[in-house]
Amino acid sequence: MLQSSFLPAWMAIQSISDIFGFHSPAVPRFNPAEATIQSVHRALLANISSPETRLTCREVVTAFLTQIETYNPRINAIISLDATSLSVADELDAWLQDSLEDDSDTPKDNSNSWSDITSLMPLYCIPVLLKDNIDTANLSTTAGCAALSGSPPPAHDAPVVKALRDAGAVILGKTNMHEMALEGLTVSSLGGQTLNPYDTTRTPGGSSGGTGAAVASSFAVLGLGTDTVNSLRSPASANGLFSLRPTRGLISRAGVLPVSYTQDTVGPIARCVWDLAVSLNVMTGGEWFDERDNMTALRPRHVRGLDYTASLSKYQGEYGGESLLGVKFGLIEGFMNRADNSETTPVNKAMCAMVCKLKKAGAIVIPITDSMYNSTAILGLDVQAYEYREMVDAYLQGLHGEESRSPRTMASLYSEIDNQEDSFLVIPHQYPFIQSALVSSPLNVSYAQKQLAINALTLSVKRTFSSLNLDVLIYPQQQNLPVRIGSRNQYGRNGILAALTGNPVVTVPAGYSNRDIFRNIPSGVPIGMEIMGLPWEEETLLSIAARIEALEKIRTPPILKAKKRKGDYGKWIENTPKVVPDRKNIHSMYPLGLYRVN
């Protein structure tokens, strides 16, 4: 991992601009809008043989920080920025310069050198944002809860964060989330309400909604989130993005403030399938078994060392064709809401259009009408409430030293007596969940009964795949558009099936609602589709997702508006800008400091 010790001693007394002989460029040299891993690397490779003129990692990171500084005040997606991101970029620049020179200071063959560099560091200089329930050693983990804002930073990076850093990524900071990852509105006592960049009257999905809104707004190339029921897929759907909820156990969940042992996962959110695959390579490339998350013991040998990008290259940049010839899709009819209204009709139209595209590309689409596939009924098997208290208690007690005054248990975190009245936020819809979680545990008889029912559900899903010889199941992530600010909850989502069975899911953009320039929705509201595969079949799943992505360019970026000024991507930033979350924009429907009706 790149740290300050990686730099030569002379770096301590000279600025990076003195070393490479460049200064603040007169014109912007890198625009972060819709940047991908490959586009960042192409920009860095241009003029690489000339230290005086080549693009630097610091300039790339500066461009993204400028994007955040300019547009985050409107959508409120960021909780905190990492003050070390620019110095890490400087380290990467110095490392690159050293790697390109031989003992006689003669530049090596550029293409071969760059290939070696990206092989060693596949995320070289890629800006990444993390959901604020994922540990980084230099930033507090708050999960959006004001009561945890004073907690000391964790002693270590989460394994997924360490993997990203070792691969050359630059961690820019932490994103807002629905507090404690318990809903999908992305409102929190510390971070306030995050707005959907496509329609600021709506929520960005959640609970990883800050990550989704940030990646959609080009605040980073990649985002990292978690998913307990919908939380990676909902923000991807609501923001026109791609996400991967991996098979439970494929990626270690250690170093993540938990909700559910049964249902939690960690995964990426990106603007293209390729970036999902690269990040998955990185996050699965370390220790094969993590004793801090014994679910990783489930990993089968055949997925060890897989290169998830290997089968994707042929589909990049090509639109149309019959790339899905013979692929069998099962369309879950029970996950559709056929009501004709302004919230559901756009979703149904987008799914109908997507099915037509799949068939035109040679796919076979089979309607699944089994009554078992009913999201509302399946939600009755959710086991979060049984596991939440014990998992949060263990995390908080393992995180904080004796001197810390931060809450050490779930009960103290939600104490209306011990805490200030604005130290936590529970939306009224969640009051019964919190009250139940405070007294429930995995020792409850009903917990065992639900686990048996989950096992039966998992077998039934496998039976559906086998009996119809399906490759994947598809359905809208949400049966309606993402809800408006102030809504009771993020209703209509279909993520519970994969959350309980542990099956992998890739979410892809499926379409948009109608544009409405008079209501300030110039791009329409995004609609996403889930593609579910069999356990450990991420390679197949990503390949199919890439072929769907290649059928037609669906993703359209939001049209961003700055609150104060537009970004200057050519300016020189000496220090990371300050970000202050807007805690005053919380809707009156969500009172602070309460979890029950008094």
Which role fits each region the language model picked out?
Residues 70, 166, 217-333, 352, ...:
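Structural helix-boundary/capping segments
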Residues 120-266, 292-299, 332-334, 473-489:
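Short glycine/serine-rich loop/turn segments
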